[in-house]
């Protein structure tokens, strides 16, 4: 009986890293997001425990625990990635299906690179909460921007002689609204890039006052 107790104690001490990692997986509900992978990790852990309880030799579990910790890390990364980034992944996938790679290559590339950067961070440091939050926000902002550019690009492509002017006037109205808010003279007779330049200078002046 005492020998069995000793072996159980050895198992707990030897597997402390794996048991601690299992608590992390439980805290982020990996069993809910990836039940089969979570079950496999638990089965491997149980198998190692049984081996240690039988042999009482930590060396017998060294290699298998290293692999188990790698598997646990992979599961943690997948879970955190799903929780933090899946909505952004879905949006980017939808844009890709809508032809964004060809229609808005620069904006779409920016969005995919921002997502990849967030995924890379999670794969290396899944518990770096503040950094992950910042990268997720950057990826979300890039995806938001790409969706707006895609929608506007499709409007331009869909425009014909009956609604092309309305589209241009709507864009012009956006600049005019800024001018009105700044109490700036009506400059709609100027090219839009010149309107934009003058309004930007006026805003800069307001900020510096």
Enumerate the predicted regions with their spans.
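Long, charged/polar, soluble alpha-helical segments
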Residues: 1-209
């Amino acid at each position: 009986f005492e020998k069995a107790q000793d072996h159980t104690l050895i198992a707990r001490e030897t597997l402390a890293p794996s048991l601690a990692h299992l608590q992390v997986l439980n805290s982020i509900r990996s069993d809910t997001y990836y039940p089969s992978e979570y079950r496999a990790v638990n089965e491997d852990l149980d198998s190692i425990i049984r081996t240690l309880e039988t042999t009482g030799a930590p060396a017998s579990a060294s290699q298998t625990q290293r692999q188990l910790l790698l598997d646990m890390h992979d599961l943690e990364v997948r879970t955190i990635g799903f929780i933090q980034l899946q909505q952004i992944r879905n949006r980017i996938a939808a844009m890709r299906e809508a032809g964004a790679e060809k229609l808005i290559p620069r904006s779409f590339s920016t969005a995919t690179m921002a997502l990849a950067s967030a995924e890379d961070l999670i794969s290396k440091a899944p518990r770096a909460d503040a950094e992950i939050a910042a990268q997720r926000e950057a990826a979300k902002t890039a995806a938001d921007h790409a969706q707006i550019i895609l929608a506007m690009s499709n409007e331009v492509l869909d425009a014909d002689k009956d609604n092309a002017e309305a589209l241009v006037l709507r864009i012009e109205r956006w600049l005019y609204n800024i001018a009105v808010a700044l109490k700036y003279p009506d400059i709609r007779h100027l090219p839009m890039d010149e309107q934009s330049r003058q309004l930007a200078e006026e805003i800069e002046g307001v900020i510096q006052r």
